[in-house]
Amino acid sequence: MRVVVASDKFKGTASARELTAAIVDALVDAGHDAVAAPMADGGEGFLDVLGGANRTDTVTGPLGDLVDAPWRISRGVAVIEMAAASGLMLVGGSDENDPVAASTYGTGELISLAVESGARRVLVGVGGSATTDGGIGALRALHPTQRFRGVDLIVACDVRTRFVDAADVFAPQKGATPAQVKLLHGRLKRLAQVYEEETGVVVGNIEGSGAAGGLAGGLASIGAELVSGFELVADEIGLD
């Protein structure tokens, strides 16, 4: 029997690559033919399963400190894992986070670097974020966004949550108090109005726009396509 092992990570325990390797070894030991196909849904591990990093650049972390963020570019295609620039782990977890101040600016810097380096297709995995800024930080780093015309910006989402709901659903996991959740909810609601007024995109109606604290919705407002992270990775690695 031939088995394709397509496992995602066990968060906090083992990476997708480690898990698939262990399962393949066990199957081979049992006399089966097994092939490893590590998977990701757009969250942590997205970069690793799509070839791994071949560049590292210094960008702005979620709370303003500089961080070294790995990413990948090959043949005009860039792969960015937002957690590498704006992730909760970068600030030491929810207890050390400032959920109101946390910004996606560094993720925007990575996207900008990718395009400046020749990428015409940019895959952004969103998940594991420290942020609930609705993507406004990233958009500030990308300004002026007109220079990204002709670039395919694709956001791999790991949730279906809509934009304004991101605060209520995920902000408590990032250290937000009930009062801060209410503040962040109101901020996202206002941002949705601003995005519609400025770009004509109704981000609140887009499934998955609440991913990474609304980063997905912010990027959608400038033309990004939001897709299922699992389906994107499956397509990219030829899992069929």
Describe the residue ranges of each PLM region.
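N-terminal loops that bind phosphate or other acidic moieties
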Residues: 1-240
